Amino acid sequence: MPCGVSSACCISFSTSSVIWERAFSAETLMPLISASYSTIQKYGLEGDFKLNLEANHATLAGHTFEHEMNVARCYDALGSIDANQGDMLLGWDTDEFPTNIYDTTLAMYEILENGGIAPGGINFDSKVRRSSFEMEDLLLAHIAGMDTFARGLKAAAKLKEERFFDDLKDKRYASYNEGIGARILSDEETLESLTEYSLQNGDIKLESSHLEFVKSRLNDYLV
């Protein structure tokens, strides 16, 4: 179902407030999204407020944008996003126009998994660079940002249609479908029984994640 209710509005104690941004370092920004939603939960405001997330602020917090969007989505709290990108080296809120298709693909994938994004949608909280001073640069920058998100959406739609991430997760957590894994999920095991199981099954064969191959396959969707 699409994210949002008709009466909801978007807030972000951590993700798009200049006050918060200037008051805290990148290290202390890290837990503030969870703190924001904890405040919403504490006062029973889940039906009234959702979070606005900004890509550049995720960078400052040491997170990926898709990680923060995923966390918000899991709590049904994804209300809007500020579409921009930051400089990975500066440690400040540069609010660049988004041009990284890899990032926008993963961001749009979270939006598709969310069933859409509402009530706020996608906002270009972006600025042209100091050297882009001609009038046409503002138009060209918006075109670049919109095209980047559009290409990200097309790639994300294909990822979702072909169950790229779903199949990876299904395989990774297949051991929870039967045996000891299934019993853990059904609360049939205790710490004592799991300790005993570990002692009796010490030589467990690990499976490779083939992570480099997975990233290579992800690149194929972006071309």
Predicted features by range, described:
Residues 1-51, 142, 177-180, 208-211:
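Active-site acidic/histidine proton-transfer and metal-coordination neighborhood
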Residues 5, 39-43, 71, 75, ...:
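Alpha-helical structural signal in soluble globular domains
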Residues 8-14, 45-49, 75-79, 115-120, ...:
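Short, well-ordered coil/turn segments that N-cap beta-strands
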Residues 26-34, 59-146:
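Gly/Pro-rich active-site loop or hairpin
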Residues 37, 43, 75, 102, ...:
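Sequence-level detector for tyrosine residue identity
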Residues 126, 132-223:
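C-terminal extensions of enzymes
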